Amino acid sequence: MPIFQWLKRCLCGDTNITIDQAIALVDEEIANLRKLERGYQTNIRNAENARDQTNVQIERDSFNDTIRLLQAECNLINLEIPTLNEEKFAITRLKSAKHFFGAVSSLKEGKALECCKEMIKQVDEDGHGRVDYKEFLQMMKTGDFSNR
């Protein structure tokens, strides 16, 4: 199941997967792709060595075809890894947003206003007691509530 489907299920509440588990799944997928790519690179080197040791043109052509196919697979993997890293970054931002809105939500439940005041103080870079758009955007990009 693609990571976005897991994430959607997590947000919609129809699974027990947590955001940290979703991040771990993305990390695992990236590690698996890197391992696969290393295997392809080994196979490419082996095919190049075998090609270089033969004088039969048909065999050389066959090795060249194999090398091209393996290189194409490596290229696909190298395109997928940045996409997965972007997904991981989006999930991390979601975790920050859930924390932020959880703190705001706790006010409705009568929980300590001090929690939100402390959060605002941590994010408020210019010390004027408010979180402006730039500060909020920075908090959401970094996933960090403490800019100081």
Swiss-Prot record:
Molecular function, one GO term: calcium ion binding
The EF-hand domain, residue ranges: 111-146
Description of what induces expression: By touch and during darkness conditions.
Keywords: Calcium, Coiled coil
Key word Calcium present: yes
Gene3D superfamilies the UniProt entry points to: EF-hand
InterPro entries on file: EF-hand-dom_pair, EF_hand_dom
Its job: Potential calcium sensor.
Protein name as it appears in the record: Probable calcium-binding protein CML1
